[in-house]
Structure formats: C-alpha cells, structure tokens
Amino acid sequence: MAAMATTASSLLKTSFAGARLPAAARNPTVSVAPRTGGAICNSISSSSSTPPYDLNAIRFSPIKESIVSREMTRRYMTDMITYADTDVVVVGAGSAGLSCAYELSKDPSVSVAVIEQSVSPGGGAWLGGQLFSAMVVRKPAHLFLDELGVAYDEQEDYVVIKHAALFTSTVMSRLLARPNVKLFNAVAVEDLIVKEGRVGGVVTNWALVSMNHDTQSCMDPNVMESRVVVSSCGHDGPFGATGVKRLQDIGMIDAVPGMRALDMNTAEDEIVRLTREVVPGMIVTGMEVAEIDGAPRMGPTFGAMMISGQKAAHLALKALGRPNAIDGTIKKAAAAAAHPELILASKDDGEIVDA
C-alpha cells in the first residue's frame, strides 16, 4: 500500500492527463508575467550573492589521483552491475527518450536505464530548426514545460522557448537527479535480446568500439536485460531508427517504409497516436514512430516528441503492471491514496506510510 500510494502521489504530478497543474504543483521559482502584445512568458527569478569562498586565495582540499580513479570506476561498475537486469531500458536520449525516462522516473519502484551513443545526450533538441536557438512547442505540450518549470513566451496556439537548450538541460537535470535512473552515455546498442518472440533487453558496447569494429579484431559486446525496451532512436541516419531496423532484419516486423514529407499539423498528432508496443517487449516513440509507420515528418516543432515520450512511459508502466494513464489506474491509485483510513501522508508529501 505504501509503495502504491507513493507512486500515485508522484505520477499524478504529471501533465500527461491533460489538465493544467495547480500553481503549487509547479516549480516554485516560476512566475507568470505579462509581456508586450498580450503574450505571457514564464520568468524565473534569480538572486546574486557573493561566493562562499575567497576567489583571490582559493585552495582545494588535497586528494590522491588514485582516489579519483577508484571513485569513478567503482561507481560506474556498480551501476553496470545494478542495471544489468532492469525494468526499462530507454534507447536514445533525445527529446522523446528523455521525456519518457523522466515520466518513468516518477515511479520510484521502476528502475530505468537510458542508453545514448553520443557523449552529449539530447539528440536534436539542443537547437531549433536550421541551427536556430528558439524551440517552438505547440499546445497542449506547454503543460509539460509548466511541470518542468521551463520558461517560455506564450502565443495563442504555441509557445516559444528562447533557447532549446533550456528544455533539454532542464528535463535532463530533473531526470538524472532521481535515484532510480542511470544514464549510460557514449554507449551504443548493437542488437536486441529476443527470446521466444519477445524483446528482453539490449546488446551494448562502448560507442567508440561500436564505430570501429572494421578497424580492430573482434570486440564482443555486453548485455542488459529488461522487462521493457523503449526505442527512441530518432529518424533515419547512421544511428537513427536502429530499433525498428533491427526488428525488420530479424523478421519481427515486415518493413520500415520511412517517414513521409513534412506536414506539421498531421505529423505531431500521428506520432503521439502511433506511439505503441510494436512487438512484445518493445515500445517505439518519437520520430522512430514515423519511420516504422510512414508518418509525415514534423520539422522543427517539438511538442509531439515530449508527449510521445510521456505516452511511451505510461505504456511501459502498464506493461510492468504499475499505475498508469493509459488504463486509468493512476486515478484509481490516487483515489485509494486519498482515504485517510488507508494511508497517512507526511506534511510535505514526500513519504507515505501504511496507517
């Protein structure tokens, strides 16, 4: 009961259900102020202060070089051991993959491993279109930005983040602060684990090793088992749509027709609608959906990436038998958690215990 109630409390603080969160549930540092022309922009307050040390006479605490090596190695190897068998593996840390992992991380009972072949996660979400800075997000995906506390300039049907990196860095920092998540960047997924017609994990290797198989002798991979794999590998390219391409190679799907020409208004709705479990054990999200279904590309608008990622997370939660927004069990869990005869909630809602 305690675990169920904690999960309900955590997952209900989501924009996925479609209703605007009350102000108290949003980032407390975010305020709303009118802008010229009637537009609204979330503004983040900040304060300046003197650093708590003398910048003219700074001296760091002494350390042995071997300690640094041991700390990095021990912690990384511990993570590899911990996540060798995990609940969900998210392949690809672009806007859809990060949104998916963030949503999953709200359930503290679900362990999430995010695998990204690049040193720098974020995919194409560090910039808008044509290497411009601003990110356009169509409504109602701005509710997800409200939840994260990302500032934006509000227009009638869309919002604009002044720099795409604000979204990517915020969702990433919020995600990585959760104790049930580990990001393995500079790691490539080379294959899938498939048993009896069900995807059961991924085959991994260092990204630089994966890129140099033709220049060295055999360099065998590692593996990571999981109950669910979420493939968010993006559209076609050297590392794009690799999940669905591999499914085609091994005969689990018939074809990967590729995405159609750009149509923003059709594309975003289609991407979210078609986000699903394409074969047992594997959910496809983001632009990889367009590759497998021949949906239009959307170009430089990012709302569908966020909402598709959230939907993929709730599909994964459903597959795990956890409260989710797909079958409405989040609301049922919340209703049970609301009865004082069943649970006691701490004042700050951080812990819930059996009554």
Curated annotation (Swiss-Prot):
Amino acids binding substrate: A96, E116, Q117, G124, V189, D220, H235, M287, R297, M298, G299
Post-translational modification: During the catalytic reaction, a sulfide is transferred from Cys-218 to a reaction intermediate, generating a dehydroalanine residue.
Details of cofactor binding: Binds 1 Fe cation per subunit.
Record: transit peptide: 1-42
Residues with the 2,3-didehydroalanine (Cys) modification: C218
Keyword entries, A-Z: Chloroplast, Iron, Metal-binding, NAD, Plant defense, Plastid, Thiamine biosynthesis, Transferase, Transit peptide
Main subcellular location of this protein, as a coarse class: plastid
GO CC annotations, alphabetized: chloroplast stroma; cytosol; mitochondrion; stromule
Keyword set includes Transferase: yes
Keyword check for NAD: yes
Domain of life: Eukaryota
One matching Pfam family: Thi4
BP-aspect Gene Ontology terms: defense response; DNA damage response; response to cold; thiamine biosynthetic process; thiazole biosynthetic process
Molecular function terms, GO-annotated: cysteine-dependent adenosine diphosphate thiazole synthase activity; iron ion binding; protein domain specific binding; protein homodimerization activity
HAMAP family on file: THI4
Note: Plant silencing THI1 exhibit reduced levels of thiamine and decreased resistance to the bacterial pathogen Xanthomonas oryzae pv oryzae and the fungal pathogen Magnaporthe oryzae.
Family according to the record: Belongs to the THI4 family.
Quaternary organization: Homooctamer.
Protein name: Thiamine thiazole synthase, chloroplastic
Gene (UniProt): THI1
